Amino acid sequence: EGNTIGEAIFDETTENTFVINEMNVPILCMGTKNIVVSASAEGILVSDIEQADRIKPYVDQIDQQIMYAEKSWGSYRVIDIEEESITIKVTLNPGHSMNYHSHEHRDEVWTILSGEGRTIVDGMEQSVRAGDVITMSAGCRHTIIAKTELQVMEVQLGKEINVHDKKVYELPATR
């Protein structure tokens, strides 16, 4: 017997097993009894039901970059982290945008996966849709504005990629 949020499969010997799965791959539980399984981009918890409420001191010891966040403008999920690159899938809600900003130590490449919107790169406005690729060099001011829900794969490239490398500007007047 299993209870689930997200995709999970339980065999006939499973008892009192609870699964919360935020990943896009299934979780298979076989012969499990009295456990909680929680899987997200932040990590995976497998715990006896009686111990699950003791998670906080252990989670506080984990030092890692946030891998998924929901914001007022949409959401993002970190797909991959390498020594000189980070790949992030960004979803912008219709009518929302990123700040008009620049980075001193990294280049960025946006690949539009779905939806429609517009970019402003160093004051130049351009319409974008699925399949378009926009490249920004370090120091370049840029933003993206969603007309419809917009999914963007953002690749950050550089030797010093960090969250503090961001300068925000006022958006220039556009059409």
Residue ranges and their predicted role:
Residues 62-64, 69, 143, 147-175:
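Double-stranded beta-helix
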Residues 1-111, 116-121, 125-134, 143, ...:
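Left-handed beta-helix
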